């Protein structure tokens, strides 16, 4: 979890309030977007009385993100208004839950990218063709395996201990507030275990599949352009849009993995600035990815627009 070493108390906390506002906005958008993804896919499951692989992954992904962003919202509020939160049993529970849900989110997004890559990409290799035929059988097992790995890795954080130095304080002249210093012990072995067990496998899978998918789409686009007769081709435009979306997903995923590593390993906790930046960056990926999923899916997009119109109508009647 985002664990900056400095937690402050004073009468007016403009920086704290600004950080809380930004994180709360990101988490609220993410929870609403993930809720829409979950609701639409759940309704589809009930109506069809069957669940596809994509629907199953999206349901798991949206549920994990709703839980994750709810914990982020609770944690950031508690850290600002109640320092004792970090010495409580509740903190350890929320810390383990935060890491577990973050790992699950990374794995589910990576498996979604892997599934789309296998279904969409076109490579003339026997092993790839065999994978295409068996991917639907393998995915449920891979999903359960990812949950098990996430849970096992997150248990490492259940024994996380803080060394609190109440006598030390730092003064920040720019923001004009006093900060109590909380030091978290960490070492290279812990950071290596954290990265290798929870972040590196899904990160490698996502980067590899997204990059190969972009390569496959670009190659197919070039072939269509060479054989195209008209000035505009809807298929080419669709491929270019898919390349842009996948590139955006890839950037957000790498950014989130880096922020998660820095957050849970306490590497940047000595810096107030970077601690705040990490806290603001962490909710960006789950919220941004969920919004992009909605924009790229006609059914989800219709539900999103309907919700926006309902909110706009409510605000008009209210004010």
From Swiss-Prot:
Highest taxon, organism lineage: Eukaryota
Subcellular location, record wording: Membrane
Positions bearing carbohydrate: 95, 167, 176, 190
A GO cellular component entry from the record: membrane
Record-annotated membrane-spanning stretches: 17-37, 66-86, 98-118, 138-158, 195-215, 248-268, 274-294
Pfam families for the chain: TAS2R (PF05296)
Extracellular side of membrane: 1-16, 87-97, 159-194, 269-273
Record family assignment: Belongs to the G-protein coupled receptor T2R family.
Designated name of the protein: Taste receptor type 2 member 39
Organism for this UniProt entry: Mus musculus (Mouse)
Gene name linked to the record: Tas2r39
């Amino acid at each position: 979890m985002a664990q900056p070493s400095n937690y402050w108390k004073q009468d007016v906390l403009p920086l704290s309030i600004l950080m809380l506002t930004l994180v709360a906005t990101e988490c609220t958008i993410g929870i609403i977007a993930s809720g829409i993804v979950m609701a639409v896919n759940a309704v589809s499951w009930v109506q069809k009385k069957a669940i596809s692989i994509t629907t199953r992954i999206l349901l798991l992904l949206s549920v994990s993100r709703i839980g994750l962003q709810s914990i982020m919202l609770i944690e950031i509020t508690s850290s600002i208004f109640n320092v004792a939160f970090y010495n409580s049993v509740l903190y350890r529970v929320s810390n383990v839950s935060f890491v577990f849900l973050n790992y699950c989110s990374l794995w589910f997004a990576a498996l979604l990218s892997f599934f789309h890559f296998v279904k969409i990409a076109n490579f003339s290799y026997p092993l790839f063709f065999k994978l295409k035929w068996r991917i639907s059988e393998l995915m449920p097992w891979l999903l359960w395996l990812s949950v098990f790995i996430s849970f096992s890795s997150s248990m490492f954080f259940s024994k996380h201990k803080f060394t609190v130095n109440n006598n030390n304080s730092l003064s920040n002249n720019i923001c004009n507030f006093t900060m109590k210093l909380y030091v978290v012990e960490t070492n290279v072995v812990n950071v290596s275990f954290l990265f290798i067990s929870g972040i590196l496998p899904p990160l490698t899978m996502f980067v590899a599949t997204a990059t190969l998918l972009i390569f496959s789409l670009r190659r197919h686009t070039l072939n269509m352009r060479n054989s195209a007769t008209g000035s505009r081709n809807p298929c080419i435009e669709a491929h270019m849009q898919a390349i842009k979306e996948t590139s955006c997903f890839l950037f957000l995923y790498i950014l989130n993995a880096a922020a998660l590593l820095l957050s849970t390993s306490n590497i940047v906790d000595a810096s107030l600035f970077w601690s705040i930046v990490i806290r603001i960056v962490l909710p960006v990926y789950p919220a941004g990815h969920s919004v992009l999923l909605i924009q790229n899916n006609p059914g989800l997009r219709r539900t999103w627009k309907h919700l926006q119109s309902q909110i706009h109508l409510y605000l008009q009647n209210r004010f």
